[in-house]
Amino acid sequence: MEEIVLLFAIVSLARSDQICIGYHANNSTKQVDTIMEKNVTVTHAQDILEKTHNGKLCSLNGVKPLILRDCSVAGWLLGNPMCDEFLNVPEWSYIVEKDNPVNGLCYPGDFNDYEELKHLLSCTKHFEKIRIIPRDSWPNHEASLGVSSACPYNGRSSFFRNVVWLIKKDNAYPTIKRSYNNTNKEDLLILWGIHHPNDAAEQTKLYQNPTTYVSVGTSTLNQRSIPKIATRPKLNGQSGRMEFFWTILKPSDTINFESNGNFIAPEYAYKIVKKGDSAIMKSGLEYGNCNTKCQTPIGAINSSMPFHNIHPLTIGECPKYVKSDRLVLATGLRNTPQRKRKKRGLFGAIAGFIEGGWQGMVDGWYGYHHSNEQGSGYAADKESTQKAIDGITNKVNSIIDKMNTQFEAVGKEFNNLERRIENLNKILEDGFLDVWTYNAELLVLMENERTLDFHEANVKSLYDKVRLQLKDNARELGNGCFEFYHKCDNECMESIRNGTYNYPQYSEEARLNREEISGIKLESMGIYQILSIYSTVASSLALAIMIAGLSFWMCSNGSLQCRICI
């Protein structure tokens, strides 16, 4: 009779109403790394490393780049005849120059402080070309005979369009004294040069005077150059060389030129009408008729991600370059569906006791599952889910905002005398990239650890919220579930979910059921103890009889000798 009562109580207990706290799970296979674990499968994750580009040169914020094609910056500014398409250019967002453009200094020579000039262009977005000394204003010198086969145009000898190579006239080269006052409101970029002949014969043939100079002065510049006559190997068919110079003439300042030979005079200058962040980018790509906020030499990036690994040289509002191959930020929970439980991580299952997630709960990250006489079902806790979503979204957006940098570094150029500085600069830049990469990877690992811990804490908080309401009206099953000692219909379940559960209303029913179950357990324990003692005694007696019978049989057939000594 007692066994029947116990069985009935156990069956009744198994059918008691229950409410469980759990979390969302899905079919996601996305994995993230944390400080302590690798390849943790999560329900949701966000890739924050951009790896793709469009392979094109694009306008930057609606402004086209100045793509110099086969011309160099020097060829463009001096006016190489093969660069006539760039005689007048509109505003640019950045300048594109090939690695080794063929149309540079057609007449061989050097461009003094060329790298500094390029640096100036990285802060300039528009030039306006103006004439400062007309070509026909040199009555005592030949202004049209200064041409060379090294700078051909339509099969004939020509010269740079924006400067004038002055030659002697009527076997005389009178000393030049010419000034220009900058009456503009903008700074002026002025270029000039000096010719270094191959020998003395060429010197007198072109300039008559055997000893010459070129002197240039402004309020900040005082320069005097003397031609260097020397025998040199031919380049572009020329043994002579030309050296070009530049300066910035401020408004109201005056530039003075004085020379008695070898002078390459400016005809045009460049008014700097718009300054701003620009750059000279080395690339062989063509314009792709597109628009972007971030450009690299190998293509444009259109991404809101905070990091990229496409190219270290960029211009615009770009993600931060890192050397990483993978940066994935966890936004969801550990993905451990109940049907396929996985190995516990460092901190065990979520909240320490809930072993599996619910794929049936699709409208929230955390929630409840109940079962009673009216049925069963899932219900998400939308308040805690929304708070978690807002917190993680704000965190991701904060990371993106902090990492987005405007007009990121573009490669610097150094002349031949600065190679050691260039090498040091590369070492420093590589070091900075290594540090940024390490910081980015560490940031992701730490944030992923915090996110997963954050979700676990939210589940635990939801569990504690239910536990504190139910008190002793239900018992904890140890798997995230509570078993009621009273009937709990759907209205009762809803009151628990919204935090309005009326403990006193159900406490008496719960107490009676709890005491009844406890009494049955105690009675069943007494029965089990009697049965246990009876079983032990009976087993021992049977074993003793078996041993005695075996001994008697062995003595009777002589297999065992029995002696009784008194």
From Swiss-Prot:
Disulfide bonds: C20-C481, C58-C290, C71-C83, C106-C151, C294-C318, C488-C492
Lipid attachment, kind S-palmitoyl cysteine: C555, C562, C565
GO CC aspect terms: host cell plasma membrane; membrane; viral envelope; virion membrane
Topological region Cytoplasmic: 551-566
Membrane topology of the entry: Single-pass type I membrane protein
UniProt keyword Disulfide bond, yes or no: yes
Key words, A-Z: Clathrin- and caveolin-independent endocytosis of virus by host, Clathrin-mediated endocytosis of virus by host, Disulfide bond, Fusion of virus membrane with host endosomal membrane, Fusion of virus membrane with host membrane, Glycoprotein, Hemagglutinin, Host cell membrane, Host membrane, Host-virus interaction, Lipoprotein, Membrane, Palmitate, Signal, Transmembrane, Transmembrane helix, Viral attachment to host cell, Viral envelope protein, Viral penetration into host cytoplasm, Virion, Virus endocytosis by host, Virus entry into host cell
Keyword check for Transmembrane helix: yes
Residues bearing attached sugar chains per UniProt: N26, N27, N39, N181, N302, N498
Compartments it resides in: Virion membrane; Host apical cell membrane
Transmembrane regions: 530-550
InterPro entries on file: Capsid_hemagglutn (IPR008980), Hemagglutn_HA1_a/b_dom_sf (IPR013828), Hemagglutn_influenz_A (IPR000149), Hemagglutn_influenz_A/B (IPR001364)
Leader peptide range in chain numbering: 1-16
Molecular-function annotations in GO: host cell surface receptor binding
Site for Cleavage, residues: R344, G345
GO BP annotations listed: clathrin-dependent endocytosis of virus by host cell; fusion of virus membrane with host endosome membrane; fusion of virus membrane with host plasma membrane; viral budding from plasma membrane; virion attachment to host cell
Post-translational modification summary for this protein: Palmitoylated. In natural infection, inactive HA is matured into HA1 and HA2 outside the cell by one or more trypsin-like, arginine-specific endoprotease secreted by the bronchial epithelial cells. One identified protease that may be involved in this process is secreted in lungs by club cells.
Note: Major glycoprotein, comprises over 80% of the envelope proteins present in virus particle.
Function text: Binds to sialic acid-containing receptors on the cell surface, bringing about the attachment of the virus particle to the cell. This attachment induces virion internalization of about two third of the virus particles through clathrin-dependent endocytosis and about one third through a clathrin- and caveolin-independent pathway. Plays a major role in the determination of host range restriction and virulence. Class I viral fusion protein. Binds to sialic acid-containing receptors on the cell surface, bringing about the attachment of the virus particle to the cell. This attachment induces virion internalization either through clathrin-dependent endocytosis or through clathrin- and caveolin-independent pathway. Plays a major role in the determination of host range restriction and virulence. Class I viral fusion protein. Responsible for penetration of the virus into the cell cytoplasm by mediating the fusion of the membrane of the endocytosed virus particle with the endosomal membrane.
Annotated family: Belongs to the influenza viruses hemagglutinin family.
Protein name per its UniProtKB record: Hemagglutinin
